[in-house]
Each structure stands twice: as structure tokens, then as C-alpha cells.
Amino acid sequence: MQPPGEDAPAGCPFSGARAAHSAPAAPAAHEASHVPGDAGWHNAQLDFSKSMSYGDYLSLNSILDAQHPLSPDHNEMLFIIQHQTSELWMKLALFELRGALDAVRTDALPPAFKMLARVSRILEQLVQAWSVLSTMTPSEYSAMRPYLGQSSGFQSYQYRQLEFLLGNKNVQMLQPHAHRPDILEQVRATLEAPSFYDEVVRLLARRGFPIAAERLERDWTQPTRHDETVEAAWLEVYRHPQQHWELYEMAEELVDLEDAFRQWRFRHVTTVERIIGFKQGTGGTSGAPYLRKMLDVVLFPELWHVRTTL
């Protein structure tokens, strides 16, 4: 496209009177060719007997051999892959969130913004994944449910670490992992450390905002609670965004993340209601009612309340 006011170059088919006399256009580069040598892959490496292939790099043999249905039901494969892929996405979300946390601790906020944005996009991917599982009907799930035993997503240790890292702490949630000392150690370490939001509150203090001492050093195993001094700091940021642009951007990245996380939770509960109604969950929870209670959890309370205060 030519900028406004500039003449099109000679020979351009859109240049008015010259259009009728312009030379025929060259064949498009993407047009299909029937010549094998021109297919675009003739120089590609085809022998991987002595080098690493795509499958080798991704350990596809291990990944694709990790689905072991216990029932004869066709739909169990969907159920397994849905949860396995969700665990892979959560692994990446944890990786990015911990990287962002390290960046915030050193006041390197631009890299943290990039990582937080990626976590939000991961959560959007997880939201869309429920659409695939929702193709399973109650009848189909009932056929395979007896084979699941007491296994449940409630027991996902990666999901629990994600909740803890985002500030929704609960000491009792260690118990489902007591039979795996290695896993228990990981989950406990996340429980006992400051959450991502705790580190952001410390960042506010480093930037000169008067945050209450008891908020900066507290029992990290407890969930995030609303704090007036934190809200006052965010109020100042939102009233003068140009003066506190990095903090303003951090606030919006966090709201974006929690927004996506809420959508993921909502799609979770609606998918459960659609498939099993209000039956008890396989892990012993109340099922949909338990998940609905989780919709009321607020991860970053001051960032939501400050919108009313403004």
C-alpha cells in the first residue's frame, strides 16, 4: 500500500491509465507446483539415524505412550488427554510465574510483564480446553467413572502450587500429597514462601509507598487478605499512572491474569455441572458446589476494590 499522496510506481497494475499496458504479473510464490524438486522440501534432512529428530527432541515416545485407559470405553482417551495437556500447560504457567517472581524481586519489571502476559494466555488456552471435554455426555462419563477410583483433579499438585503461588493458601491442602514425600516437599515450599502478589506488595514498599509492616512480614501460609495500606498505594498508582507507569502496568497485568483465572474456574464448574450434575466428586469433594465456592475467591483484593474507590 502506497502512503497517501504518493504516485504509484510505473508498471503498477493499480496506476490508472497504465493498468491496461502493464506487464503480466509474475506467478505467485505460493502457487502449487507439480515439479517434485520444487516442492520446497527437497533439501530437507530425511535421514535421522545419526542425529536428533523432532520426535527425539520432544520425547514423543514417552509422551504418546503415557495414555493408559482403564476402561473399555472410547471416551476415556479424551478424559486422559484433557487432563494431561492441562498439566503440561500448568507446568509452563508455573515456570513463567516463578520467572516473573524472580524478576520482580530484582526490580526487573519489563521481563516480568512479558511472563505474566504469557501466563494469562496459557490460562486462556486452558479455558478453551473445556470446550473439548464438554463434548462428553453424562452417559459417556458414567460408563468410565467407576474406573477412576478416587483420583480427582483436586489432587493435582501443580494446580495446588499455582493456587498457592497466586496467594490462595490453605495448609490443609497439603494432606492429599502426604503419600508422596517428594511432591509434598514441593507443595509445602510454595505454601511457606511469599506469593507472587506478596512480592509485588514488597515492590510497592521499595518504590516508597507506606505499606504496613505487618503486611510486609507475615505468616506466608495464610491466604491474601485485604490491606488498607496496599489499597492506598494502588489508589495513588491509578490516580497518577504516568508517574508510576511500571506499577500501573503491573497492576493491569495482575488483573488480566486473575480475570483469565476466574474464567478458567467458571468453565470448570459449568463443565462439571454439564457432565455429572451435582454428584459428589470422585475425590470426595461436593463436586460442583465446591467449585462454585471457589468462584468467590479473590486473589488480588485491593486491585479489584480500588476500582470502586477511584
Swiss-Prot record:
Annotated substrate binding sites: 79-83, 141, 145, 282
Region (Disordered): 1-36
Comp. bias intervals (Low complexity): 15-36
Keyword Heme attributed: yes
Keywords tagged on the record: Dioxygenase, Heme, Iron, Metal-binding, Oxidoreductase, Tryptophan catabolism
Annotated pathway: Amino-acid degradation; L-tryptophan degradation via kynurenine pathway; L-kynurenine from L-tryptophan: step 1/2
Pfam families hit by this protein: Trp_dioxygenase
HAMAP family linked: T23O
Function: Heme-dependent dioxygenase that catalyzes the oxidative cleavage of the L-tryptophan (L-Trp) pyrrole ring and converts L-tryptophan to N-formyl-L-kynurenine. Catalyzes the oxidative cleavage of the indole moiety.
Entry protein name: Tryptophan 2,3-dioxygenase
